[in-house]
Amino acid sequence: MTFTFHGGEPLLAGVSFYREVLPLLSKELSHMHPEFAMQTNLWLMDDEIADILAEYKVPLGSSIDGPEDLTDYQRGDEYFTRCMEGYRIAIEHGLLVRFICTFTNSSVKRKEDIVEFFKSQGWVMKLHPALPSLKGDNPNAWTLEPEEYGELLVWLLDYAITNPSFEIMNVNDLCRCVFTRSGAVCTYADCMGSTFAIGPDGAIYPCYRFIGMPEWVMGYVKDKPSIAELMESPAGKRMTAFKDHVDLACRDCAHITYCRGGCPYNAIAPTGGELEGVDPHCTAYKRAFDEIVSRMNKEMEAPAASPMQRRSRVKRMEKPAVMPLIKRIIEK
């Protein structure tokens, strides 16, 4: 079992909170072998907090969108500097830190700069597309459209193939999904009933992304509900309805086994809980999955051919071969 401390900003809880809660959870749930993780902007990281997090081997996730000017443009002045100072402290204490990058309709135009920045830092890259805001008068101000996101994923696939020392987690996940025919991360898997989030007041949600949305409260910790009871709540039933909808709407899709309609939050939250379709990024996922499957099939055709003949065929292809990348991913 993994406990992830997520935002708001979990470092606001202060060092005393973690000195109490980490030993408590480790002791009381020792039979479940608990592990911990944290998503933080790192601004409040200091030596004391870093010490206790390092003691319990808590990996950290944070957000950097690329070079300093681009990150500050998207996240506010001095975000980059403050985040990197916290990163420095965390690294000095031996903490593992990884960054996620948000691609917007603006930053995607600088994809080369962003990838080269991550590569120059020696970081593993993880990304997600900017989604329509659920608040404000201009919800699509930063939104990366699904078609553009799909082309970005294919571009990143080629980059990962031609730069084997640089790891892009999203590309790894897509390739692993196709090769194993199973969802590699929660976006491409039926997460219902296996993933929950708990708000500061003890409210239980289907996922951290629903926290703060009262209509998605499944129950409360104080009532000690079972998983079955949580799934019988109105919010739980809406999640199950999404799964049933995917079975019907995606039944003819070649990728249904390892995509499962994408993320339920992406599909349901923007519509006020109404089930109107699958994840809006279906177009992007399908574009990337189609590309991987097409290349993989071409490279694996005519298995009786000699190694020299197969290499010759791969060389004649206009697109970089994907199987060497998949082999590296699977063998990890």
Where are the model-predicted features located?
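Active-site neighborhood of divalent metal-dependent phosphoester/pyrophosphate hydrolases
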Residues: 8
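Generic recognition of stable, solvent-exposed alpha-helical segments in well-folded globular domains
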Residues: 16, 82-85, 109, 113, ...
